């Protein structure tokens, strides 16, 4: 990643890959991201920041998810924590809804940026439910501080109409291909859209961002537009956090 030109990583809280058995597994994971992953990234001259949350995929176990949310509070003031996220929906149910709203409340109380996860199925329902929750929480006036991730062709216009930042996850097999992401950019412009990648439990490619930059160059996009969607839009979003200190 360093050799490919990546300078900064913002890592959101993910799910464990298998069912969690105790609050301690959340604590270990959060500390691992804050401490070990930051140190590891910096050894390769990459700055590293963290978004903290109980991930939507792990938000339905009771009382575990609520206990984890209580435990999360002591980590939020750590210097590398720049946002609450990912939060939102996986299966779209009332248990996920409860954790989503509680974590939105935390973001407001702590004046933190928010990263929202759209479900991988029923995305239209997911964006509509997300809009409804944001409206009920009186957050439609704060959408410049909200990133909605995992957009597709059927959600991106609604995300941008809300005034939120729109994440496009380029990921082999299950999410967007580079060409799908580029087609969405051609249709919707480059403002408030950011390309991101993943390195998780499935087939993934942490070099998806420079890959998209290369493919955009082949298609004749300007240097400015390429840099906006692969770097500067994300930079503009995250620098709203006082703890995001990296500068070009």
Feature map (PLM): residue ranges:
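Mid-domain alpha/beta scaffold segments of enzyme catalytic cores
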Residues: 1-110, 116, 121, 128-133, ...
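Short, acidic/turn-prone active-site loops that include or flank metal/cofactor-
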Residues: 13-16, 170-175, 199-200
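Short acidic active-site motifs
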Residues: 154-156, 177-180
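Short active-site-adjacent structural elements
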Residues: 175, 202-206, 238-239
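Short acidic/histidine-rich active-site segments
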Residues: 190-206
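Active-site glycine- and acidic-residue-rich loops that bind
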Residues: 58-66, 169-178
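Mid-to-C-terminal alpha-helical segments outside catalytic/metal-binding sites
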Residues: 210-248
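Short helix-capping segments at alpha-helix termini
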Residues: 42-45, 136-142, 188-189, 218-224
């Amino acid at each position: 990643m360093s050799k490919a030109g990546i300078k900064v990583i913002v890592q959101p809280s993910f799910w464990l890959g298998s069912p969690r058995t105790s609050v301690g597994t959340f604590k270990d994971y959060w500390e691992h991201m804050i401490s070990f992953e930051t140190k590891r990234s910096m050894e390769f001259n990459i700055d590293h920041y963290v978004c903290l949350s109980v991930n939507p995929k792990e938000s339905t176990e009771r009382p575990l998810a609520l206990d984890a949310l209580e435990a999360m509070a002591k980590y939020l003031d750590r210097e590398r924590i720049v946002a609450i996220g990912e939060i939102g929906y996986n299966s779209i149910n009332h248990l996920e809804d409860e954790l989503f709203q509680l974590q939105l409340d935390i973001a407001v109380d702590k004046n933190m940026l928010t990263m929202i996860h759209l479900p991988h199925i029923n995305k239209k329902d997911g964006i509509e439910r997300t809009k409804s929750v944001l409206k009920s929480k009186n957050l439609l006036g704060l959408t410049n501080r909200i990133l909605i991730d995992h957009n597709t062709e059927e959600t991106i216009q609604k995300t941008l109409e809300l005034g939120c930042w729109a994440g496009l996850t380029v990921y082999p097999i299950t999410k967007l291909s580079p060409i799908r992401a580029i087609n969405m950019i051609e249709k919707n412009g480059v403002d408030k859209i950011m390309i991101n990648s993943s390195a998780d439990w499935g087939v993934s490619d942490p070099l998806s961002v420079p890959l998209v930059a290369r493919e955009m160059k082949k298609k004749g996009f300007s240097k400015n537009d390429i840099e906006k969607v692969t770097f500067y839009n994300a930079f503009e979003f995250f620098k709203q956090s006082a703890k995001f200190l990296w500068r070009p």
